[in-house]
Amino acid sequence: MPRSVNAVASRARRKRVIKLAKGYWGRRKNAWTIAKNAVERALQYAYRDRKAKKREFRRLWIQRINAAAKMNGLSYSQFMGKLAASGIELNRKVLADLAMNNPEAFKEILKKVA
């Protein structure tokens, strides 16, 4: 009996990986083993960095809020504490956007919490 190999599934799997490797440099885009390794590593980086992106943006928003608050005589922690105590429920993303693009509105919020 001849050896049974599922060539259709194997070819589909290889095509999928080679398609994901499109745009890579050198043999990474067309040599099966090298492309497989490159795509696997790229997917690991993508997974890791989707998580890191959330942390990085939070850090950026905090830095922007801190800079705007310090220009008005408050530290970040003092500002956030007073914001929570006053019952204003704005998240860091919105506060950072206001601090950057609409400083007058941010100053109004500072006046309300102080």
UniProtKB/Swiss-Prot annotation:
<comment type="similarity">
    <text>Belongs to the bacterial ribosomal protein bL20 family.</text>
</comment>
<keyword id="KW-0699">rRNA-binding</keyword>
<dbReference type="InterPro" id="IPR005813">
    <property type="entry name" value="Ribosomal_bL20"/>
</dbReference>
<dbReference type="InterPro" id="IPR049946">
    <property type="entry name" value="RIBOSOMAL_L20_CS"/>
</dbReference>
<dbReference type="GO" id="GO:0000027">
    <property type="term" value="P:ribosomal large subunit assembly"/>
</dbReference>
<keyword id="KW-0687">Ribonucleoprotein</keyword>
<dbReference type="GO" id="GO:1990904">
    <property type="term" value="C:ribonucleoprotein complex"/>
</dbReference>
<keyword id="KW-0689">Ribosomal protein</keyword>
<dbReference type="GO" id="GO:0006412">
    <property type="term" value="P:translation"/>
</dbReference>
<dbReference type="GO" id="GO:0003735">
    <property type="term" value="F:structural constituent of ribosome"/>
</dbReference>
<dbReference type="GO" id="GO:0019843">
    <property type="term" value="F:rRNA binding"/>
</dbReference>
<dbReference type="GO" id="GO:0005840">
    <property type="term" value="C:ribosome"/>
</dbReference>
<protein>
    <recommendedName>
        <fullName>Large ribosomal subunit protein bL20</fullName>
    </recommendedName>
</protein>
<dbReference type="Pfam" id="PF00453">
    <property type="entry name" value="Ribosomal_L20"/>
</dbReference>
<keyword id="KW-0694">RNA-binding</keyword>
<comment type="function">
    <text>Binds directly to 23S ribosomal RNA and is necessary for the in vitro assembly process of the 50S ribosomal subunit. It is not involved in the protein synthesizing functions of that subunit.</text>
</comment>
<dbReference type="InterPro" id="IPR035566">
    <property type="entry name" value="Ribosomal_protein_bL20_C"/>
</dbReference>
